[in-house]
Amino acid sequence: MTRKAILASFAALMICITFIDVSMVAAADKTCDRECLKGFISDYIDALLAQNPASLPASSNVKFTEDCKKLKLGEGLWKSKISLTDYRRDIIDPEKGTAISFLVLEEKGSPVFYVFRLKIVDDKITEIESTVVRGREEGMLFNPSNLKTISREMAYVPKKEQLNSREEMIKMAVTYPEGLKVGSFVKVDSPMAPDAYRYENGQLMAGPGCTFFQGCDNMKSQRIPTLAGIRYKVLAVDEKMGVVAIRMNFGPGSLFQGNGELDVWHSFKIYDNEIHSAEAYCEKVPAGTEFGWE
């Protein structure tokens, strides 16, 4: 190969390398970080309040579900005139491009629990998964008086040395549904802190001060039902806040009375190798109901 040919080949190689570098930077720029994902949550809430789904940066084939049913974006709660309260708790997962928010809204003067998940790809909303809980009849439990502000535990930002890895957090969080599957958190050795607590629809169901059931003041050792038919999927891991979000269907036998099952959006505060708290929104659904994303 002549010197001229060698120089030409080298120049072509440098152009290719430069193109690759620019492409990689452009791809990195498309990554939606924490603030970006929080912004999408705020945009979604603003559009919902304005009843204007067209204002959302949604993909042309966005999938939207509410209460496990596939709907057209703009249906369901979007048709109601709602207002905000002070309660908003976000779970942010930049690695998955996922943002979740637990809200307490007001509809016709009554409190409503609302939770939704957004999937962001290339600065577009591609998935919206949501649940609306209007009162005790729908939720089995309903105590909005305990959801005025985010709890101190959930608001706590763990120090870097307290945080567990993403994989460790998931492994610890799934001991909750696995414990329900066998009817014991002790049997699966769920790493619950001695003062761990659990709220469901604002009702204290486990931990210090719990009187709902006998022995519920200890989350790990309390008596729980055996829910062999439980199904679950991990939705998001907030590695900065130490929170894992899991959606569950508790399956047969999960209601206090009557037919049906309990559909649950759970979140677990995890750091220092322990589960410190669990907070969830729950809704009764007909037996055999799928999540809508199978």
What residues fall within each predicted segment?
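Bacterial N-terminal signal peptides that target proteins for export
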Residues: 1-10
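C-terminal segment of classical bacterial N-terminal signal peptides
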Residues: 15-24
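C-terminal and inter-domain tail/linker signature
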Residues: 25-294
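Intrinsic disorder/low-complexity segments
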Residues: 6, 20, 142-145
